Amino acid sequence: MRALLIGRNPRLTLIRIVALVAVFCVAFGFVLLPIRVEGISMLPTYPNHSLNLVNRLAYLWHEPQRGDVVSIRLTGPHGLFMKRIIGLPGETVAFVDGRVLINGKILDEPYEKYSCDWNRPPVTLGPDEYFFVGDNRSMPLEDHEHGVKKRIYIVGKVLL
């Protein structure tokens, strides 16, 4: 049994353990950020209290895309929220009778399971701005964290 746990060479086993710990420290210290959902704004895609991972390096080589679920920083270092990107830089976003309009055309949202009756006047996004909203549209618009944020507020892409 000892041979299975330690192997034939205890020194090599120790080196492997140290390397594995180093990989985990780098992964969870710099690349992957665990985030817990608090609330129902992302139902049914992400249930309340579910644990997810955010890839902080996801947007180093390409820009965020419409439909990506991202973690955004809204209120200081610990104020992270999970939201879906529906509007990209330069686009005009509006809500009319619960439907999202991008540049005047209805956005197909296969992930949306709960309809709403939201109305929001058109807003044109700047060159570095995105429009975020949760998947659970059954909540009143006033109770829903949503809206326009600059690219710098995106922490990373949600993996799980």
What are these regions (language model features)?
Residues 1-160:
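Extended hydrophobic leader/signal-anchor segments used for secretion and membrane insertion
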